[in-house]
């Protein structure tokens, strides 16, 4: 509402469908593996709405909208599994998606992601966790929704300005790259000047940090000084490039 976008959420559609069928969302996901009509029903609706409303500002909240919505700015909003579990525990999603404990929520999220990944590969031959499918990948683990929304809007405007061409960008909090113990007193002294410059940065630092990624763990392989300075300065985001 604040940004005057309509929101179409396939997750909400799926939860409503699960409730109507007296199932949990995980049970519906498992059913959808053997009966693809539900996937096609939801995904066809996504494609139809985008075709019928080319001039509307619509946010498609969907794991596969990037594959069905033409001429769109494609964003993947990531989050650590631990924080995702905390969020769903605190989110009222109805009886069909209610958890008894944090551990149960985390386990169910992992199972759901695995089930959906297999299903999407079976039906559409796509991997929604392949970040090259997106114009922007932004991690939400440590940042506020307002800052994330502002960054997405700014990047989308650049996309429009550049003739709907985008160079894929991946943004994470420096807290995803480092822990407090990774930064020594010597680091704080030697990086003082860079950190002071970064204190003036409201959103994203200008250096691209090269990392390796193993599941949810990032390891910095180039640009560690910039990652540490961003951590010290409490900058919301750094740009990263994942390398093999």
Spans of features found by a protein language model:
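ATP-dependent small-molecule kinase phosphotransfer cores
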Residues: 6-69, 82-85, 94-97, 107, ...
């Amino acid at each position: 509402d604040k940004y005057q976008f309509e929101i179409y959420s396939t997750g909400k559609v799926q939860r409503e469908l699960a409730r109507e069928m007296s199932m949990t969302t995980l049970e519906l996901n498992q059913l959808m593996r053997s009966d693809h009509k539900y996937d096609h029903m939801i995904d066809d609706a996504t494609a139809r709405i985008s075709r019928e409303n080319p001039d509307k500002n619509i946010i498609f909240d969907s794991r596969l909208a990037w594959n069905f919505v033409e001429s769109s700015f494609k964003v993947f909003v990531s989050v650590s599994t631990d924080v995702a579990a905390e969020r769903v525990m605190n989110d009222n999603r109805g009886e069909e998606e209610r958890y008894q404990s944090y551990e149960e929520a985390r386990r169910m999220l992992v199972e759901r992601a695995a089930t959906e990944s297999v299903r999407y590969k079976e039906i559409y031959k796509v991997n929604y966790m392949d970040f090259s499918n997106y114009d922007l990948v932004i991690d939400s683990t440590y940042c506020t929704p307002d800052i994330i929304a502002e960054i997405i809007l700014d990047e989308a405007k650049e996309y429009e300005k550049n003739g709907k061409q985008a160079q894929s960008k991946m943004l994470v909090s420096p807290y995803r790259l480092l822990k407090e113990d990774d930064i020594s007193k010597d680091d704080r002294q030697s990086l003082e000047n860079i950190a002071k410059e970064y204190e003036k940065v409201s959103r994203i630092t200008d250096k691209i940090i090269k990392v390796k990624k193993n599941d949810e763990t990032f390891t910095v392989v180039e640009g560690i000084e910039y990652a540490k300075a961003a951590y010290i300065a409490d900058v919301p985001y750094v740009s990263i490039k994942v390398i093999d």
